[in-house]
Amino acid sequence: MNVLKEVYATIEKRIEEKPEGSYVAKLTTDDKKTAVNKICEKVGEEAAEVIIAAKDNDKAEIIYESADLIFHTMVLLAKSGITYEELSEEFKKRMK
């Protein structure tokens, strides 16, 4: 299993099970609209940090902040009921 798929599965599990102390559970426990708004704020914040790191030409920081951006985007997708497989299918369509 690839690491992104593993992370996505963990996110889905934490949204479902809401374990105490879980960052994902904390982000996603509110009603859907409030949770999505919180997650969108994080996605925007992380996107800005990727942009700053890229403009600074800081490779390590670009990698670090990109991982945060991808993670929070995955939380948003999972909270929206989108599966890893659905996302993968969309990428496959675009490879043609």
Swiss-Prot record:
Annotated pathway: Amino-acid biosynthesis; L-histidine biosynthesis; L-histidine from 5-phospho-alpha-D-ribose 1-diphosphate: step 2/9
Keyword Transcription regulation in annotation: no
Alphabetical list of InterPro entries matching this protein: HisE, PRib-ATP_PPHydrolase-like
Subcellular location: Cytoplasm
Keywords linked to the UniProt accession: Amino-acid biosynthesis, ATP-binding, Cytoplasm, Histidine biosynthesis, Hydrolase, Nucleotide-binding
Known EC number: 3.6.1.31
Top-level taxon in the UniProt lineage: Archaea
Keyword DNA damage: no
GO BP term (any one): L-histidine biosynthetic process
Any one Gene Ontology cellular component term annotated for this protein: cytoplasm
Catalytic activity: 1-(5-phospho-beta-D-ribosyl)-ATP + H2O = 1-(5-phospho-beta-D-ribosyl)-5'-AMP + diphosphate + H(+)
Molecular-function GO term, any one: ATP binding
UniProt record similarity statement: Belongs to the PRA-PH family.
Matches recorded under HAMAP family: HisE
Protein name: Phosphoribosyl-ATP pyrophosphatase
Lineage: Archaea, Methanobacteriati, Methanobacteriota, Methanomada group, Methanococci
